[in-house]
């Protein structure tokens, strides 16, 4: 195991601590709800859904968080402005946990950010994300909200190397006019969650994971990813699982452990239905890391899985 010379920044988002030295704080786990095709949704555009089932899913994640000691975030996805506001209103009522404001639509993301600001949920809200594709209108609108936390996505299609990813955060790497960190700061963001933008196997997945070390060595910011997307994009596994369904959850949930072992502070582990698999697996990895890091001067916090599960 390893310890960074750079002082590590620990974010406090509504009482949830994200960051620190490997083995110090437990990995924060975010499960996605209201994703495209989610069975609990009745109308994706209008945001009509089964509230009882949605609450049960969130409460299960909450319970697993209590059991293992791994804090949780509700990754709240919405396709439209109307839908995401309804989802955020619901999430804000049923849990005290932080939540991601997530959508493929910039208009929907801003609608969610505006809603969170208007009703006093800005301290729990995390924008997803400031990235190279964000246009001026979205950035200007984000600036007008009260949000202070955001994922900053290190995706650089022109140069997917470690240096290319660092560059897109630092100065734009010749691809955009300024670095993503500067762009985020101009929008009022001062709590950066650095997403290393893991791409498919054979197309830079390993490089993205290695970027985790670089981020924490250079800036000390919390780092993580939605690494579970890697198995989803693996053609061989998609074919193999047709006859071997048991292989899928092993790779899907297991991918998160790779991010953790590379110094990750948070993982977006996929559908919230996977909470009962993801939390024990990630808690186990945290115990491994913490035990290994003790000899080099890193002590786990009181509610770490090392103390809760041993």
Swiss-Prot record:
Pfam families (alphabetical): MtrH
Reaction(s) catalysed by this chain's protein: 5-methyl-5,6,7,8-tetrahydromethanopterin + coenzyme M + 2 Na(+)(in) = 5,6,7,8-tetrahydromethanopterin + methyl-coenzyme M + 2 Na(+)(out)
The keyword Methyltransferase appears for this protein: yes
Gene Ontology terms for molecular function: tetrahydromethanopterin S-methyltransferase activity
The enzyme's E.C. designation: 7.2.1.4
InterPro entries in alphabetical order: Dihydropteroate_synth-like_sf (IPR011005), MeTrfase_MtrH/MtxH (IPR023467), MtrH (IPR028342)
Principal EC category: translocase
Keywords: Methanogenesis, Methyltransferase, One-carbon metabolism, Transferase, Translocase
Pathway: One-carbon metabolism; methanogenesis from CO(2); methyl-coenzyme M from 5,10-methylene-5,6,7,8-tetrahydromethanopterin: step 2/2
Gene Ontology biological process terms from the UniProt entry: methanogenesis, from carbon dioxide; methylation; one-carbon metabolic process
Function: Part of a complex that catalyzes the formation of methyl-coenzyme M and tetrahydromethanopterin from coenzyme M and methyl-tetrahydromethanopterin. This is an energy-conserving, sodium-ion translocating step. MtrH catalyzes the transfer of the methyl group from methyl-tetrahydromethanopterin to the corrinoid prosthetic group of MtrA.
Family to which the UniProt record says this protein belongs: Belongs to the MtrH family.
Subunit structure: The complex is composed of 8 subunits; MtrA, MtrB, MtrC, MtrD, MtrE, MtrF, MtrG and MtrH.
Protein name, per record: Tetrahydromethanopterin S-methyltransferase subunit H
Organism from which the protein derives: Methanothermobacter thermautotrophicus (strain ATCC 29096 / DSM 1053 / JCM 10044 / NBRC 100330 / Delta H) (Methanobacterium thermoautotrophicum)
